[in-house]
């Protein structure tokens, strides 16, 4: 049953906590909540949205699934607040478990997406979560069969129903970017011109770097046994674990449930903000000047322009000159005439993680001739003095290894920093194209 007073009381406490701990310039908090919906049987798929408010102002009561399961109604509510001076944005998360709901070409009522829908969605949802503990939502082997890394941290089950398969079509962001181009070609607007963040989804705001500092999620999901981090010998099983719905008794004994054992360490959201304040961070999120990592604290810059090849990485004003002459990640580049776009990609490793191996560009576009979207994988810089193969356009392996027993990785392979200026010599000015940068370690 829905307890209205309890709902308001909990929301009031959340806002009070956000205000108490917000310290501009040092530690930024937002008034925010999770809009949680779930489709009815037999689909039972779901994907949730984190709704973040820009300022200390917040509505008296958040819009919940008790109001509507329709995301368009959520956007209408957000638009109404915005007209009253209260800005917000929503971030869909865990699209990989949505069973194709996130990047479908139809509205909630089944009618085709149109321009009004596209404009409203982009106004309210400029970014999407691409990775978290319940798997990555970048791409899937069925969607990117030519990408040998497409199976990275794949969880094939639905969110909210781990026994059911989640349809990849409509659940992964690289395909979503392509669908957006196809919809724009059909003059229906582009609702999927999105930026990315990564998250943990542990519901405690804590990032886990290794097993020694794992703070878990809920209490019943925290122990190494339940998370599948270590085997579960029968002699160590307690009655509490035996009675937990995360453990099942079979002829072979006890084992950890699939939901927690498949969880990864989670991702991180990186935001290029002018200051550590609500206004600056919210502005960067809205402008999509963000990127995601799968957990490592990689530092990444990605710019595009008409002619960035004459800029010097060693110039003390290098970054400011790029902003003057180009656009940052998440932006549109409008070329003045039949020119080739140039890109600056600059990545630095996390000192506590593995060295960098390559910078890869995913190029996607709509082919008028074939009447379909396509994507190409292009390695633009390799570590260890290697060069991309002229035919495959991919770097050769640098033979770095990772031990499956100890997780130790090669420390004499890879680079602390990779950077390059890359020009797309095959660019067609008549075809709208997107570029996604990936850093491999």
Label the model's feature ranges:
Residues 3, 7, 15-18, 37-38, ...:
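C-terminal functional module detector
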Residues 1-86, 90-104:
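A metal-dependent hydrolase metal-coordination microenvironment
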């Amino acid at each position: 049953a829905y307890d209205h007073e309890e709902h308001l009381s909990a929301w009031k406490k959340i806002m009070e906590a956000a205000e108490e701990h917000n310290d501009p310039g040092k530690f930024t908090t937002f008034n925010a909540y999770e809009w949680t919906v779930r489709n009815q049987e037999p689909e039972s798929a779901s994907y949730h949205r984190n709704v973040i408010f820009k300022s200390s102002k917040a509505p008296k009561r958040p819009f919940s699934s008790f109001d509507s399961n329709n995301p368009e109604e959520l956007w209408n509510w957000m638009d109404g607040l915005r007209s009253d001076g209260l800005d917000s944005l929503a971030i869909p998360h865990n699209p990989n478990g949505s069973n194709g709901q996130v990047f479908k070409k139809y509205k909630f009522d089944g009618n085709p997406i149109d321009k009004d829908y596209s404009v409203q969605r982009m106004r309210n949802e400029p970014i999407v979560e691409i990775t978290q503990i319940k798997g990555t939502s970048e791409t899937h082997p069925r969607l990117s069969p030519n990408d040998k890394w497409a199976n990275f941290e794949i969880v094939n089950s639905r969110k909210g129903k781990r026994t059911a398969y989640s349809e990849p079509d409509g659940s992964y962001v690289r395909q979503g970017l392509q669908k957006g181009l196809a919809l724009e070609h059909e003059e229906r607007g582009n609702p999927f011109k999105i930026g990315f963040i990564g998250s943990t989804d542990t519901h405690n705001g804590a990032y886990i770097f290794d097993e020694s500092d794992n703070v878990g999620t809920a209490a019943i999901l925290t122990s190494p046994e339940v998370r599948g981090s270590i085997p579960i010998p029968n002699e160590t099983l307690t009655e509490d674990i035996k009675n937990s719905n995360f453990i099942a008794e079979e002829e072979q004994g006890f084992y950890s449930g699939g939901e927690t054992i498949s969880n990864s360490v989670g991702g991180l959201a990186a935001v290029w903000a002018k200051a550590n304040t609500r206004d600056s961070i919210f502005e960067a999120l809205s402008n999509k000047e963000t990127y995601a990592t799968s957990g490592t604290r990689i530092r990444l810059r990605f710019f595009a322009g008409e002619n960035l090849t004459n800029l010097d990485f060693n110039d003390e004003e290098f970054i400011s000159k790029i902003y003057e002459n180009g656009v940052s990640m998440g932006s549109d580049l409008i070329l003045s005439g039949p020119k080739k776009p140039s890109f600056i990609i600059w990545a630095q490793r996390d000192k506590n993680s593995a060295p960098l191996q390559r910078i890869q560009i995913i190029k996607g576009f709509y082919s008028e001739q074939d009447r379909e979207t396509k994507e190409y994988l292009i390695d633009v810089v390799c570590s260890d003095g290697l060069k991309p193969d002229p035919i495959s356009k991919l770097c050769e392996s640098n033979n770095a290894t990772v031990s499956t027993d100890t997780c130790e990785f090669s420390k004499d392979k890879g680079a602390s920093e990779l950077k390059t200026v890359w020009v797309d010599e095959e660019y067609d000015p008549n075809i709208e194209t997107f570029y996604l940068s990936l850093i491999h370690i």
